[in-house]
Amino acid sequence: MSHFAPVALPHANRLINHGPTVLITSVFGAKRNVMAAAWSMPVEFSPPRVAVVIDKSTFSRELMTAHGGFGLCVPATAAMDLTYAVGSCSGRERDKFAHYNIQAAPGPALGVPIIEANCLAWMECRLIREPHTEDAYDTCFAEVVSAAADSRVFANGHWTLNDGNATLRSIHHLGGGLFAPAGEAVQARPLPPTRPG
């Protein structure tokens, strides 16, 4: 049974606001790919837009440019080894979905591969062509057109991370195959006003 529920687009950026490592999925014709990306972030609220760094020489970049969109999935700790594996090899040599037995379904808006197993959230992203930033900095911009998240940890536009769901945490790549899970969510309190002087 899937615990995934749609996320309202005004809240979609919150799915990656905390800087998790993500899985980028792409497809064009009969070719498909999945790769890991440590550098992604929201860049605009309305419409929701994201940026992700994907090297121009990668198979993923080729597919997403040809298709005009990509999937962005947030893996949980259970997918840490898989995330490292798909980020360490090229999809030009093998279909990583088949090789690693990754189950994916076409997204509802763009048809890009969406992964829910061992993931916390996903977004379908329509590529916004910015040739200068793509070529000079390998930074790709996209508009989020649909999103969903595991309702056990994301509901009403907010993450709910606590000791009761420690296995349902996003992962953050520290380099060299070392990852850290997201910590417990804590609420900031307003500070009292300061007096001049």
Predicted segments, located by residue:
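Basic, polyanion-binding surface patches
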Residues: 1-197
